[in-house]
Amino acid sequence: MSSNKTSSFVPWKVATILKHQKTLEAVIQKAFLPGDPAEALNSSQFCETTAALDSTAPCKICQCLHQLCTHHSPDLSFYGDYAIICYYALHAPKTMASNLMLLADCLELIQLYFPDAPSPPPNINGLDIYLHFFVNRCFRLANTEKIMEWSNLDMLKTEFLRATLSGSLSGAFCFKTLWPSLTRAPVRMADECTCTPITNPGCGLDGGKLFHPACIGKDNFLDLILIFWKNTDAMTPANSLLADTLSRHQVYFQNLTPVETNASLDPSPALDTTQGPCLLSPALCLQKKNHTSSLCLLCECLASHSEAASVFQTFKHLVLNSINNKVKLLDRILFLQQDADSLSFIQDRELLKSVLVNCSPQEIHKHLFCDPLCALNSSLTDSVVLFGEVPDFEFTAFKATLATGNSLVHRSFQSCEILETLILLFKSLQTVKANKTTVSEIIKEVDASLKKHKFSLLSCYYTFNIYT
């Protein structure tokens, strides 16, 4: 029978990542793409990792937790601890760093409440975490009348993620015909978004007085993220050099070489290490275009550094207001990067400031002014929640309330299934082959949805063509 004991579990701690280093290393080693995608289907390891994207596949995280709870009857505090992980996921950006941290938190939860269960749980990887917490958000309460609408959007997102790995959309796919049937499209472009009935709005707790900022750097793990991508094409040469320097002084995660299977048992192609462990990232692949990559390093900073969100907000303000003339945004960014005094407001000068200075101006331009996923991540990220501190007694009561599910909403950002679906489709289109009609229709819908939600960005038409 379940008991009700007090739990001291707190998500988003770097100590949790380090504690589960061995398991996380194994997950990272299996997150590399084959060098020849055409031969990927011959690899049982690749097929096992990506099986979650099958249109009829169940959620591995849901299945794992359901089986554990059914067979082991955990303490009641388990449900509060799982709910607080979900709450943190709502306030985190959709990045590789977030996927890694959430996986570590889930491993910790299983170890705490199910000590007799197999550890680690078999066949759980970063893609499963991404689908559960960020794509499908399985933990959210849904308006029953809208469950089919919500499910259709999830199926569409899965289809585009699958296309990201295969390289192309199905020839039978027609967005112009399908999209109006999935959403209650407004008649006029200026109408408000119609997405809010999909989830139950207005039932969250005001956690504004609960979380308090912690000391800068207490649970930052940006150094680990840089190390994971040090030998890849994701970063500029200067940031790669910084990552290499960090790696030489770090005793953790030194065994990240991808696992090569026995050719006689699994005739898999050689793995592409230049793309890094990209199956842990939302992009599921690594592409470069005009000095940017499909892995946004600044978004990774949001998830892994407590100061990043405020720094980028201040930097954006400086870009927009430091010059009165009509100087291009890229030039403004360059001027600030080259002026040491202009970045003196950054407290973490050794790491965060170095990363920002080492980024290409195009990376910063894309993140601050162009990319819809970067804009969404900036709105979702709440550093006070992710890196803040909460009194133990209040935190225990807060977790118990969250366990009912009614309060699992963002503190300040209005959830929008339609917007998040369109952004995922847009990002997938940047890496897959699709007909021009599909591309233009999706870009039009993304631009319209961004305007409805008060995002001020350059047209997605330009972002689609110049960046990745």
UniProtKB/Swiss-Prot annotation:
Segments forming a coiled coil: none
Keyword tags: Host cytoplasm, Host nucleus, Metal-binding, Zinc, Zinc-finger
Chain intervals for the UniProt region annotation (Zinc finger 1): 59-138
Binding residues annotated for Zn(2+) 1, in chain numbering: C59, C62, H132, C138
Molecular function GO labels: zinc ion binding
Residues covered by region (Zinc finger 2): 296-374
UniProt: Zn(2+) 2 binding residues: C296, C299, H367, C374
Pfam families: Herpes_env
Family of the protein in this entry: Belongs to the herpesviridae UL32 protein family.
Protein name per Swiss-Prot or TrEMBL: Packaging protein UL32 homolog
Species classification: Viruses, Duplodnaviria, Heunggongvirae, Peploviricota, Herviviricetes
